[in-house]
Every structure is written in C-alpha cells, then in structure tokens.
Regions:
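N-terminal interaction/assembly modules
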Residues: 1-86, 139-146
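A short pre-motif secondary-structure segment
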Residues: 95-96
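Helix-turn-helix DNA-binding module
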Residues: 102-119
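DNA major-groove recognition helices of helix-turn-helix
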Residues: 116, 120-138
Length: 146
C-alpha cells in the first residue's frame, strides 16, 4: 500500500461516493454526447475539410468509452461494497447512506445514529481504507513511487 498515493486514492473514493447517485446520469450523458457527436460530425464533414477530423473523432470516442468504463468500474466497486456492508455491517451501510448519499451534516448523523463526531471520523477512515484496499486489489488506482 506504500506504493500508492494514499491521499489521492481517498479523494477519488470520496468523489465517487459523493456522486454515486449521479453516476448513471453521467454515463448516459457521455454516451449521448458520443452518439450526437458521431451524427453531427460524419464523413461528409471529413470529406469537405480534407483533414484528420475522422481520426480526432475516433480518438474522442475512445476517450469517452474509457471514461464510461472507468465510471462503471467504480460504480460496480461501490455497489459491491454497499452489498457487503448491507449484509454484514448495517451501521457502516447506514452511515455511508447518510453521509455520502443524503449528504447529512455530522450533527444530523449524530442525531440519527447516536455517533459522536470523533466516532464518525473514525468510521469514515475505516470505510475509506477498506474501499481503498479493495480498489488497490482490483488495480483501480495507479501505482506511484512514494
């Protein structure tokens, strides 16, 4: 775990957790963008301009597909973690739902779950470290020398 940029991994995990409810929308928008782009910039434009826009279109489509694949991979990981916590640890599951999906403040979470802010911080670290370890095992984070 030393070879991975810890802070960057945690930030990435929190990014996907906070935007989990919007991931399907993001995937569909990227797919629509790729489809619309293909129809509006077809072969006719390439023939008229006599340039390498066809290559640019192909590169852009590949980049969009890579982004969609990456988002789906993170979505799948989060789904698996949620299912794991839902069956094994209801407290962590509820905490994730309240903090990241409903975006409640620590005070509201304290009222609902009877957890102090320190306990919430500790629970956050445990959850994020668990997700980080799973993401590392699945090669979802890039290796960096520390």
């Amino acid at each position: 775990m030393e070879r991975y940029l810890y802070n960057s991994g945690i930030k990435k995990i929190e990014y996907y957790l906070k935007r989990y409810n919007l991931l399907d929308l993001k995937i569909s928008k990227l797919s629509e963008f790729a489809d619309d782009y293909n129809y509006s910039n077809g072969y006719n434009k390439w023939l008229k301009n006599k340039c390498s826009s066809l290559e640019e279109d192909a590169i852009r489509n590949i980049e969009i597909e890579q982004r969609i694949y990456k988002i789906r991979k993170w979505q799948s990981l989060i789904n698996a973690i949620l299912e794991h916590y839902k069956s094994k640890d209801k407290v962590k599951y509820k905490f994730i739902c309240l903090k990241y999906f409903k975006k409640l403040t620590p005070i509201k979470i304290q009222e609902r779950m009877n957890l102090t802010e320190q306990e919430q911080d500790d629970l956050t670290k445990v959850i994020l470290n668990f997700i980080l370890s799973v993401a590392i095992k699945k090669n979802m984070l890039k290796e960096v020398e520390v």
